A protein has these predicted regions:
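Conserved catalytic-core motifs of GNAT/GCN5-like acyltransferases
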Residues: 35-41, 56-70, 193-205
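Conserved N-terminal entry element of GNAT/NAT acetyltransferase domains
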Residues: 67-87
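Short alpha-helical segment within the catalytic ATP-binding CA
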Residues: 19
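Non-membrane alpha-helical segments in proteins
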Residues: 4-6
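Intrinsically disordered, low-complexity, positively biased terminal segments
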Residues: 8-14, 22-36, 47-48, 84-222
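Conserved hydrophobic beta-strand within the GNAT/NAT acetyltransferase core sheet
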Residues: 2, 37-42, 173
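Short, structured loop/turn "capping" segments at alpha-beta junctions
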Residues: 58-60, 75, 102-108
Length: 222
């Protein structure tokens, strides 16, 4: 996955960004197995540039913002289903994540769910993991990512628990537009679209459970 491609304004227009982007693209292609893909979330204004490098548009990932005045109520049916993610065996978390992300990322997940000033929750249903999410404090407010869930009910319960972490400030959620249930969740909670990126792939789009992706991990990391 390619992300975080920025050139300082005083160095733009000199071909440095173009050289850097093509060098990074070539390096990633050299590391991949034949037939593997590269994904990215690119700003809309640069979509035509990435297309010239072979990347094909898949869908939009949209950043939503909400001001969280107080901890949202957890649906009564979900009480007891939302648990600290540390209560779930890590192998179960890793297996669930693998259905929503196209590569194993055990080392990353261990660090991501245990990062300071963050909260990681799981949704347990009928003795199995039915979703998980992480919220972390950032430069402005808090950001949820990822938010993976079997269905809208599980996502709603997780969102309620995670949003409470941001009470008193803004909360951001990066929603894939190709999951209507995720878009509905954002609108149901009065979230406002403030930014967006084009998800693009060089090579075939990965076979993941898009219906489970209610919030991507980050625009930089997929």
């Amino acid at each position: 996955f390619m992300g975080f491609f920025i050139v300082r304004s005083e160095y733009r227009g000199q071909g440095l960004g173009d050289a850097l982007w093509h060098a990074r693209r070539a390096r990633l292609l050299a590391r991949l197995r034949p037939g593997a893909s590269i994904g990215m979330d690119g700003v809309f204004d640069m979509q035509h540039y990435y297309a010239k490098g072979g990347f094909v548009f898949s869908h939009r990932d949209l950043r939503f913002r909400a001001q969280i005045a107080k901890r949202p109520d957890t649906p009564s049916a979900a009480v007891g289903n939302v648990v600290p993610l540390t209560d779930i065996p890590f192998d179960d978390v890793l297996a669930y994540d693998r259905t929503c992300f196209p590569a194993p990322r055990a080392d990353f997940l261990k660090a991501w769910i245990a990062q300071p000033d963050a909260l990681a929750l799981g949704y347990r249903r009928d003795g199995r993991l039915g979703g998980y999410g992480v919220v972390r404090r950032c430069g402005e407010g808090c950001k949820v990512g990822p938010l993976f869930a079997d269905d809208a009910e599980a996502a709603e319960a997780l969102y309620g628990g995670l949003a409470g972490f941001a009470a008193g400030g803004p909360l951001f959620l990066d929603v894939p537009e190709n999951n209507p249930a995720a878009m509905a969740l954002a609108r149901r909670h009065g979230m406002v679209e403030v930014f967006g990126c084009a998800r693009m792939y060089l090579g075939p789009a990965p076979a993941i459970a898009h219906e489970r992706v209610f919030g991507v991990t980050t625009f930089e990391l997929g």
